[in-house]
Amino acid sequence: MPNGVFSNLNSKGIEVGIKLVNSHHVKAVGFTGSLKGGRAIYDLASKRIHPIPVFAEMGSVNPVLIFPKKLKKEYAELAKQYAKSITVGSGQFCTNPGIIISFESDDFDLFIKRLVEEIEQISPSCMLHPNIYNAYNLGLEKIKQNSNVSELTREINITDKNYPKHVISHVSAEKF
């Protein structure tokens, strides 16, 4: 890449992002992440003396449909692939799957059991920002308060800041 071009900046706060968006050298911003973060970037960019465009994908949840024939043949491999896919980048990629939709069956039960086993073997990785980590944990707490949702992964204690616990939860289509 040419000098001065980058695709990602990590920091412990929002100061780097604010400086970047406000820099007169920056002519546009691309962002993938939360609605709150994207909106903050948009607001900064629009308040500049010479406003700049913001290209943002914010707050997506990507569904995955798993059909019975595929599940019957490849439940173990699908579970392994899905576990890797949802944990890559600490789950922060815009293309990460977010929800599985399938029919209830013995094969689906085998898939879920294997998924939990696979995900519990993957070490947590650092999230991009403390606010993302905090929002993730607040979301988990909110989900735990819903009696229709059951958490399938075991409780673990992670002491590293910004390293989230991997969680698989279940809710029926009727209750969703």
Region locations from a protein language model:
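Generic recognition of flexible, low-complexity loop/linker segments
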Residues: 16-18, 53, 87-89, 139-140, ...
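NAD(P)-dependent aldehyde/semialdehyde dehydrogenase
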Residues: 105-176
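Catalytic cores of nucleotide-enabled group-transfer and carboxylate-activating enzymes in metabolic
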Residues: 22, 70-71, 80-84, 88, ...
